[in-house]
Amino acid sequence: MIYPILIFILAGLCEIGGGYLIWLWLRASQSPLFGLLGGILLISYGIVATFQVFPTFSRVYAAYGGVFIVMSILWGYVFDKQTPDKYDVLGAIVCIIGVLIMLLPDRS
């Protein structure tokens, strides 16, 4: 189960990092280079997600959505200094429970 978790984390870093760089370019008046690098990271995210071991696109992307939520909250805390409130934390916990419900059952 370590490999899928690492792929989810790498995908999240690519997607959130790419989106953040584009945000900085367009909303914080950073150099267009931020936008270009952000676009490259977003394309990389789409490629990294295909390395998942789960058989269906829908399950991979739905489960990744929960991971994305948690990582986005952590990204905001680390890079934007936005402390999550109790509702952010509770929502993230609910999402991870949903991810585990989707991915852990043996469907064979």
From Swiss-Prot:
The keyword ATP-binding does not apply. The chain crosses the membrane at residues 5-25, 34-54, 60-80, 84-104. It is a multi-pass membrane protein. Its main location: membrane. The keyword Ribosomal protein does not apply. InterPro entries: UPF0060. It is found in: Cell membrane. GO terms for cellular component: plasma membrane. Keywords: Cell membrane, Membrane, Transmembrane, Transmembrane helix. Signal peptide: none annotated. It comes from the Bacteria. NCBIfam families: PRK02237.1. PANTHER family: UPF0060 MEMBRANE PROTEIN YNFA (PTHR36116:SF1). Belongs to the UPF0060 family. This is UPF0060 membrane protein Sca_1835. It comes from Staphylococcus carnosus (strain TM300).
